[in-house]
Amino acid sequence: MMRGLDTTVRRLRRKVFEEVARLGFKSNPETLNDDMEAIPYKMVNEDTKIKYRESVYRARAIVRERLRLAMGLSLRPENKPVHLTAGVEASNISDKYYEPPLMQVIPSACEACEEKGYEVSNMCKGCLAHPCQEVCPKGAISMVNGKSFIDQEKCIKCGKCKSVCPYDAIAKKERPCQKACGVNAIVSDKYGRAFIDNDKCVSCGMCMVNCPFGAISDKSQIFQLARALSQGEKIIAEIAPAFVGQFGPNITPRNIKAALGELGFSEVYEVALGADIGAIAEAHHYVDKVVTGELPFLLTSCCPSWAVMAKKFFPDVIDEISQELTPMVATARTIKKEHPDAKVVFIGPCASKKLEASRRSVRSDVDFVVTFEEMQAMFDAKGIDLSRYEAESSFHDATGAGRGYGCAGGVAEAIEKCINEYYPDVQVNVEHAEGLAECRKILTLAKAGKLNGCLIEGMGCPGGCIAGAGTNIPVAAAKKSLAKYVQNSSRTIPPKEVAEIELD
C-alpha cells in the first residue's frame, strides 16, 4: 500500500500541482502559454535531483500531460500534433472547469505491466514432492535446471500451483491499477497499456494511487480556484472530517483556518456540520421507510463512488439509495444560505467529489472541489507554513458523530447512535463495506434479499474517506488522528432539531 508514502511519484504529482497553482495565483493571461511551456523544463533538467524517467525527454513529455490534467484539460491525442496549451483559453477562468472524463491514463507514462499470471521465483528449491506439478490441470509446469518452470502458453492462471507451494516460491503477477479497481474498469489498449472503461469507472481514484509509475491522474480545479482567490472574490471553505493530520501531525484546526485565511478564504466550515444534519435525516429516513416496511433496506449515499456504483451495476436498488443531502451539499447550502454572495470550496480526501459537484443538482451549491493533496500544493505555491499561523477561534463546532463520517463504518455508527437516542424503541441492523469489491458483494447480498431491514453503509475507498485518493498521510495515522478528534468533540450526537433546517 503506497498511500501516504512520500514516493517519487507523489513528489512529481505535488510539484505539478504547485506549479499550476502558481500560474493561477499569477493570473496573467498574456504570459500563461509561455509559463506553461517552461514548467516541464523547470521540473526536469540536468540539475533535477529526482529522476522521473530514464530519459529527460520522456519525463518532460509526461510532465506536459500531467500539466494539462492539472489545468483541468484533457490529454492530447497520440496520433496528431496538438500544442501543449491547446484549449487553455477555456480553462483560464475563475470558475469551475471540467472536461470529462475525470480519470485518465497517460499513455506515455504507462509501462504496460503484465496482467494476471504466475511466475516461479528464485525461492524455488526444486523439491522432490513438486506439488505444483501435481496440481496443475494443464501440465504447464516442468522442471528446468532443477527448478519449476511454468509454460505461459499452457498456463490458465488458476493459481493452484501457488496455493500448494511450501516455499511460497510462486509469485502472482497482477497489474497494480487493475488489482486496485473494484469494478473491473481497467482494460488494455491495443499496445497492452492500461485503459479506463468509463462506462464502468466510478472515479474513486484507487487505480491512480496504486500505480507505481504515476501513469494515471485525475483532473484538478486548483488553477481556477487560485485565479478566483487572487481576484479577491468572497470564497468560503468547507473542509471534510478526514482533514485531521493531513497537513502535519501537529497542525490544528486553528492553524488550518488561519492558513486558509492567508490564502484568501473568507471563512471555514466543517463538513461535519452537514454530516450532523445528514445523520439525523438518515435516522428518520430509516425509521420512516425501513422499519415500516416501505423499503427493504436503506443505502447511504455520502460516498459518490459507492452511490454511482450501485446505480451503474445494481439498478434494481436505486430506490433504496438515500435521497438525503450528502454532507458536502448540506454544508454548502448552509453556507450559501448565510452567505449568498460567496463561492464555496469543498476541501477533502476524495477525487469523485469533483464529479458529484458537477451534477446539475449540485453545481450551484459547490463551486470548486480540491483534495487535501491539492490544497497542500496551493499552500506550498504561496510559501505558507501552516505551523506559523493560528486563528483566534476554531471551526464551527460539529459533533463527534458527524466527524466520525471520515472513517469506514462511521456513517452507519452516527446514524445508529441517533436512532438509539431519538427512537429508542427501534432496533437498527447495520452493515457496512469498504472498498468497491466489498461494496459489490454487499449489494449482491442486499439485492438477493439477505439484508432486509438493514442500514447499509458503503465506502468506495478501503478505510473510508481517510484513505481517499487525495489524502496526504498513511491510513493508519489518519485513522488514529481522526479517532482522537472525534473523542475530543464537545458533543457526541447532534440535536434532533437540525433535521428541521430548510436546505432544499
Located regions from the model:
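N-terminal [4Fe-4S]-dependent radical SAM core
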Residues: N92-S121, K138-G139
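Active-site-facing alpha/beta catalytic cores
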Residues: M123, K154-K157, S203, Y286-V287
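Short glycine-rich or small-residue beta-strand-to-loop segments that form or flank ligand, phosphate
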Residues: E119-S121, D151, A237-I239
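Acidic, serine/threonine-rich, charge-biased low-complexity segments
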Residues: P77-H83, K96-E99
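Glycine-rich adenosyl-nucleotide cofactor-binding module
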Residues: C113-E134, S163
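Iron-sulfur-associated redox domains of electron-transfer enzymes in respiratory
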Residues: M1-E78, D218-D504
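Iron-sulfur cluster-binding cysteine motifs and their immediate structural context
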Residues: A129-Q152, K160-D197, V202, M206-Q221, ...
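Short flexible coil/turn linkers enriched for glycine and charged/polar residues
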Residues: E114-G117, H130, G159, G205, ...
